[in-house]
Structures are given as C-alpha cells and as structure tokens.
Amino acid sequence: MSSKSSTQHTFGVHSEVGQLRKVMVCAPGRAHQRLTPSNCDALLFDDVLWVDNARRDHFDFMTKMRDRGVEVVEMHNLLAQTVAIPEARKWILDNQVVPNQVGLELLDEIRSYLEGLPDRELAETLIGGLSTHEFPETHGGEMLELIRDAAGVAEYLLPPLPNTLYTRDTTCWIYGGVTLNPLYWPARHEETILATAIYKFHPDFVGKVNVWWGEPTTDWGLATLEGGDVMPIGKGNVLIGMSERTSRQAISQLAATLFEKGAAQRVIVAAMPKLRAAMHLDTVFTFADRDCVLIYPDIVNEIEAFSYRPGEKPGSLELHKDRGSFVETVRDALGLKEMRVVETGGNAYVRERTQWDSGANLVCLSPGVVLAYDRNTYTNTLLRKAGVEVITITGAELGRGRGGGHCMTCPIIRDAVDY
C-alpha cells in the first residue's frame, strides 16, 4: 500500500483482527551485533542472534505484510528522518545525553560528537549504542582512556537497544490514540523516548497523534505498561494483561484516562503468572479471526479476569471480578454466541516448546489471515484446520528475544470489526 493510501485513514487501532493498514517495525541491526553471551541476559535476549539471517528473515516478514496491502514503516528510517529536524534532534539529545545515562565525565563531549553525526548515523547510534572504544579519542581525550581502563570493553556510553525489534511494547495504539509506555526493565527505558520523538516531530505524525497516557521523561515508579499486554478488541473493550511487565498501578491509571476521554467503556484485566515464557498477554493469547483465538492453555485456563468500568463520580473506577473463564469473558464482551478456541497443540513437551518459540504470538493481517513462525508446525496445522490462513515466517533468529509476529509489530492503523 502506498503512503498516500494509508493517509486516507486516521491513525488508530480499532480491533485485533481488522484489516491492518499501517504498522511500525524495527529491523535487526547494530544493536543485535552488540549481543554477546555475557550481556544477552542483561539485554533481555536468551541467546545471541545470527544477525545476517535475522535481517533476511525480518525483510521477508515485512515483504509478506506488504504483499497483503499493509504499509510497513521501519523505525531506523523514521528516526533518521526525525533527527534531520533540528528541534527533534535537540529534544532527543536533551533527553538521552544526561548524567544518569552517560555519566558526568564526558557529557559535553558526547553531546558535541552526536550533534555532529549525519542523520542516518545518529539514528543508527541511538538504537545501536555507542561504546567507549568507538568514541573518538579526539573528543574524549585522557578522560576517555581512564573510563576505558576502569570500565572495560563492555562499557557503553549509550546502551544498545536490541529490544526495539519488538515494537509492540514501547507504544500502543488504543482506538483513536496512543500510549507512551513506561517499560518495566531499565534496558528498555530509552526506547520510549525514541518512539515519542517520531510521533512528536516526524512529518507523517506531527500534529496528528492523540496521546492518551504516558510521558517518557517522567519517573513512573511502579506504574509500568508494555504493549504486548494491551489489546483494543472492539465494542469499547480493552484487554490488558497484568503480567511480569505491566503493573496494576499503570492499568488503573490508563483505565481512568481512557474512561475520562471517552476512549473505552471497559478494561478487562487478565491476572497472569509472572513468568519469562509468558511475559505478556500476547505470548499466551492472540486472535486468529473475529471469533477465533489461539491460546496456550496451561496459562490461559488459569487466568482470572477482572473488569474496570467508570465509577459514579468523575475520575473514579469500579472494579469487579468477572464470572466464567477469561475466554468466556472476552466472548461475552464482544457479544459473540461462540468463541472458537484453538489450543497450542501436542503433548505437554510439545506445548512447552511451542510456547517458548512464541507459538501463540500471532499477528492478524485481516480477519482469518495471520503471520506465524514456521517452526510451530503442529499449532499451525491446527489453525489451518480451523479455517485460518497461516502465512509462515522464519523464527530461528527473530524469536531469540521471546517474541513473534505480534511482538514485532506496532499497528498504527487497523480497521474495526463488526460484532
């Protein structure tokens, strides 16, 4: 789809399965070349990537979406176009090059160096990181040598951000607006600043973005929110997983804001166990069609559902436990007589492996058409038997941070579905 076509539609995501029209992704790159066996845990990856293959597979992922009429925009490109705007470049550096991030010793020198970089190189550096050994001695002088000697080869003046691969989490579009999310792990905090800069300054977005909640320069304390837990499913309902990475404090604030602004009528909270293999709601539960969901039963069947609704007083909330199972709660919220459920398949061993390989992490391109990792053959076969068209992508490298197609996409424009 051309850029001209997508601009005929207002930014907003009105379902999980309607026609996907515009999406933001972030290709593997320099940040993933930084991953080593000694730092990958701290950077939230379970292993290092074969980066060349990851790039190839991600390009195929983007191509398959474009072949189905989706406009795909890539974060490195958007950021390079954003930092070409002097005001945007200054805003990013004002918020990235700060003592808490880079230290005091070389603060002015790092700022001066970054200000002088070409647009594309600055974008690559903001996402890919800047090590002490890459920083020019002409800028750092004797202080740089001392920092190198003291901190060693693993020290970064700007940290790499490999989790930008999973664009779902940093911001999430909920009906007609977006949230700028305070992420759980420190390794990801800077991602939201970069995404915010794109929405705030890029010509495609400036003046067109309605921010519901969140501000990346604010300390949110225990209020953390990640987009993998957030699903605007339609009919004024929003699903939010209370998970390893999304907290009750954030959910209640977001619910109150959505109600106050008339953006939603009900927020259904999925109370989940706090597990690495089920870090977000979308790792165990995704839609495959308007009336069909794929679930990892070992987790989803244990989810307790609660619902926030507007209280009687302005700004107040009512919270009630929902009757029935989580899937039944979702079915009833959408007014469906029946919700078809496909469970990730096989015996206990196959199910656990499938879950580790993001087998339940589908992204719908349109009703009944999904992208899924090729390696989860058993589950993909079950989806096809249920009438779902499954387009496969290679997940051997892309999934090493525990995310699939849903995690790797930030929908910006998606149609509603009639229920």
From Swiss-Prot:
Residues annotated as the enzyme's active site: C407
Family according to the record: Belongs to the arginine deiminase family.
Gene name in the database record: arcA2
InterPro entries cross-referenced by the UniProt entry: Arg_deiminase (IPR003876)
Keywords carried by this UniProt record: Arginine metabolism, Cytoplasm, Hydrolase, Plasmid
UniProt subcellular location: Cytoplasm
Gene Ontology molecular function terms on file: arginine deiminase activity
Entry's Gene Ontology cellular component terms: cytoplasm
Annotated protein name in UniProt: Arginine deiminase 2
Record GO biological process: arginine catabolic process to ornithine; arginine deiminase pathway
Keyword field contains Repeat: no
Uppermost EC category: hydrolase
Catalytic activity annotation: L-arginine + H2O = L-citrulline + NH4(+)
Keyword Lipoprotein: no
EC number: 3.5.3.6
